[in-house]
């Protein structure tokens, strides 16, 4: 990803078990719920979220600092709360981008066309998206995801 800009994704921590061929320190840092809670108590996370009971996801400060010290520009794929926390921590050193669908109706169409979720799950995801859309003004820039290719072009033009 982004050799000319030296972009690299952050590696998140999670308390869920590895799936398939996932490796610790590559796709995620895999922690037990107890280890995750201890690191929260120690202030080691830039941001974190308990998505379900004992199912945490978060970004470790030390990992991001290691990437920054290596000269990488770190890209985070986080929810709106995480994005706001990271921006608050790094201030002007961070560029926050909110990626949104062209409309809620288009998002619903995309979710339905996948054929992977029940109508109830889609309704829950739409409700979550509507909530998250209220955070868009807090971000430095907003990119509309018309298609994967156009979203990439928008990112490249920043």
Tell where the protein language model's regions lie, with residue ranges.
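Switch/connector loops and helix/strand junctions flanking conserved nucleotide-binding motifs
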Residues: 19-21, 84-86, 104-110
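Conserved phosphate-donor/acceptor-positioning beta-strand/loop module used by diverse small-molecule
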Residues: 76-78, 90-111
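A conserved segment at the C-terminal end of the G1
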Residues: 1-5
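Conserved small/polar residues in nucleotide/adenosyl-binding loops
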Residues: 147-154
């Amino acid at each position: 990803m982004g050799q000319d800009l030296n972009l690299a994704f952050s590696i998140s921590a999670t308390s869920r078990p590895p799936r398939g061929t996932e490796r610790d320190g590559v796709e995620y840092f895999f922690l037990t719920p107890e280890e995750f809670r201890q690191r929260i108590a120690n202030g080691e996370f830039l941001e974190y979220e308990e998505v379900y009971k004992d199912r945490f996801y978060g970004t470790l400060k030390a990992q991001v600092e290691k990437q920054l010290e290596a000269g990488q520009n770190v890209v985070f794929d986080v929810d709106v709360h995480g994005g706001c926390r990271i921006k608050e921590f790094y201030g002007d050193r961070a560029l926050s981008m909110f990626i949104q669908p062209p409309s809620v109706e288009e998002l619903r169409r995309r979710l339905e066309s996948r054929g992977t979720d029940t109508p109830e799950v889609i309704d829950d995801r739409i409700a979550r998206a509507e909530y998250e859309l209220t955070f868009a003004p807090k971000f430095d820039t907003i990119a509309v995801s018309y298609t994967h290719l156009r979203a990439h072009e928008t990112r490249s033009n920043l």
